[in-house]
């Protein structure tokens, strides 16, 4: 049973595709098996820029299986993602955000939970 995956949403405006994901607790391989196929369907290449809003709530990290799935997804879409905004509450979540940088060409920024509107604005900018 999945623990960490909570929600996936798509918002499209003015040639920008923003995919929102919400996670909490610990992400495991089963979480990835649930949401990656949904992501792949949203990733249809139609020329739009793809950006992610990732909201972490009481996030504790990844299992090894989840890290492997994340690595595979990241390498497959290395050039496809333009920006990633990670919204969280604590230092651990910020460190996890820093860990993702080598696995993507996307510009990655961490925003505190209180700054979620700033994160959304940044993702919506051209």
Where is each model-derived feature located?
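Amphipathic, Lys/Arg-enriched alpha-helical "gate/interface" segment within cytosolic domains
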Residues: 2-126
């Amino acid at each position: 049973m999945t623990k960490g995956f909570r929600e996936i949403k798509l918002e499209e405006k003015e040639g920008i595709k923003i995919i929102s994901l919400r996670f909490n607790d610990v992400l495991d391989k089963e979480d990835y098996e649930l949401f990656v196929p949904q992501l792949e369907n949203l990733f249809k290449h139609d020329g739009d820029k793809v950006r992610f809003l990732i909201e972490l709530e009481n996030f504790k990290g990844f299992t090894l299986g989840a890290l492997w799935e994340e690595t595979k997804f990241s390498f497959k879409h290395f050039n496809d993602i333009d920006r990633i905004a990670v919204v969280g509450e604590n230092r651990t979540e910020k460190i996890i955000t820093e860990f993702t940088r080598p696995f993507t060409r996307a510009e990655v920024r961490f925003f505190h939970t209180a700054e979620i509107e700033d994160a959304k604005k940044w993702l919506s900018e051209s």
